[in-house]
Amino acid sequence: MVKSLSEFQLRKRPSWSKKWGVLNLSTVPEAARGKSVTLKFSATASNGQTVSYIMGPYSITNMDRKLDLVATDNKACYLSIADMTLYDAAGAATNAAKIDLVYLYRSIAGITFAHALVSPAASVDYLPGITLPSGVNKSTKMSKTWALNDFNLARLQYGIYVDDVDFQAIDFTNAPNFVINLKAQAGSWVETADGKYRAYIYVNSVNNTTSSMTVSIKRYLMK
């Protein structure tokens, strides 16, 4: 995660992480995604003398992001990382091959469960009261975090940026396929069952009354 005053974020302009040498664009053209770029700065003085400075090459980010998805228990609760979309049961049945996680909220006496993201293939102990649509059966690896307030997702005062290299470095060996007791400013690293995507899911807010949770996602294409 980048913590650097040299990093800047400007709306509709690229942000450059000097530490990692990654151009992080708000909107990345598909043709440029994952490639590299060299920057050349030139100036001409009043006497005609010229000077130029070349920087790079820098890698263009291979990430996408989606903000403020509202997951609601037993409604829009089926999350697809490929689509970065939440589906209800009918939508999940139609897109079964894309469903990676189920959101649920449970208040269980003697157990700290609350807001959870659970793989469809997890033990039924972590899916109480859930009847999965036909074909929804993936096992998604997860690693819970706390206070990793990525600026793009949290939009708080913190100068932390989850970048491409962070997704590459995460070790999912022996990772569980569920996370429970999620709270605002918590999050989870995620790897899809086919290994195609990794993602960071940030929890913006939770609401016990409406059994809902608002999340924002950064997704990284691995292969």
Show the residue positions of the predicted features.
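Surface-exposed, beta-sheet-biased, low-hydrophobicity segments with strongly acidic/polar composition
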Residues: 1-223
